[in-house]
A protein has these predicted regions:
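N-terminal amphipathic, basic helical "cap/leader" segment at the start of enzyme domains
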Residues: 1-94, 194-196
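Short Asp/Glu-rich motifs
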Residues: 32, 59, 155-156, 163
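A glycine-rich helix N-cap at a beta->alpha junction
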Residues: 75-78, 83-87, 160-181
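Short Gly/aromatic-enriched secondary-structure transition segments
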Residues: 53, 99-103
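Small-aliphatic-rich amphipathic alpha-helix that forms the alpha element of a beta-alpha
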Residues: 40-42, 85, 105-157
Length: 196
C-alpha cells in the first residue's frame, strides 16, 4: 500500500498549481520534454491503448505556425511560451495493440468500428493530456491548457498524411505569476458529489 503524498506535493500538483497565461524567459530543455513523456506514459489508458501523439512546438517557426491557427489571445500565449504541445489522438491507435496489450486480440475490438475508435481515442488522449499536465507539474514546470483553435487547420498543418487529429494544446514553461488572476472558486465536496 502506498503512503499518501505530503502537503507540499499535493500543493505542487493541485492546490497551488495554476494554468498560466505567461511564462518567465527560462528555456525548457529537450531532456525535460522527454522526462514528461517518461512519466505520463505510465498513466492508465483503456487496454493500454496510448492514443495520444504529441508535437512539441519549440522553435519560433513552429510556434508562429500554430499561433496563426488560434484565437488571437491564445496565439499570443503560444508565442510567449517556451514550448507549446499539441496533444493529438491517433485514430489508428489500435494497430499498436498487439504490442501494447499482447495478452488478447484487442485490435479486433476496434477494426471497422469507427464510433468506438473515435470515442476511445478522444477519451484516452484526454486522460493522457491530464497526465501530461500533472507530469509537467511534478517535474517543476507549469502549463496552460487551451482549446480556442481551428482543429481542422491544425490537423492539416501538423498531422497531414496521418490519422492523428488534434485534441487540445498546452503551453509549457516556468509560469509568470504576474500573468494570472486570483484563483476561481472550487466548491466543496457536497456541491458536486453524491455518495450512494
Amino acid at each position: 500500500m502506498s503512503e499518501p503524498l505530503n502537503d507540499a506535493a499535493l500543493d505542487q500538483l493541485f492546490r497551488e498549481a495554476r494554468s498560466y497565461n505567461g511564462y518567465l524567459d527560462t528555456p525548457v530543455t529537450q531532456k525535460q520534454l522527454e522526462q514528461i513523456w517518461d512519466v505520463m506514459k505510465f498513466g492508465p489508458t483503456s487496454a493500454n491503448c496510448l492514443p495520444a501523439r504529441i508535437i512539441w512546438c519549440n522553435s519560433d517557426a513552429a510556434k508562429q505556425k500554430l499561433a496563426a491557427l488560434c484565437m488571437p489571445a491564445n496565439g499570443d500565449k503560444i508565442l510567449q511560451a517556451p514550448v507549446t504541445a499539441i496533444i493529438g489522438m491517433d485514430l489508428e491507435f489500435y494497430e499498436n495493440l498487439p504490442e501494447l496489450f499482447p495478452h488478447t486480440d484487442a485490435r479486433s475490438w476496434f477494426v471497422g468500428n469507427d464510433a468506438l475508435i473515435e470515442k476511445t481515442a478522444f477519451r484516452n488522449s484526454s486522460l493522457q493530456g491530464a497526465y501530461f499536465i500533472l507530469a509537467a507539474r511534478a517535474l517543476g514546470l507549469d502549463t496552460g491548457a487551451m482549446s480556442g483553435f481551428n482543429n481542422a487547420a491544425v490537423d492539416e498543418a501538423f498531422f497531414a498524411g496521418t490519422k492523428v487529429q488534434s485534441n487540445f494544446i498546452c503551453t509549457l514553461g516556468y509560469g509568470d505569476k504576474a500573468s494570472i488572476f486570483e484563483r476561481s472558486p472550487r466548491p466543496a465536496f457536497n456541491r458536486f458529489n453524491s455518495v450512494i
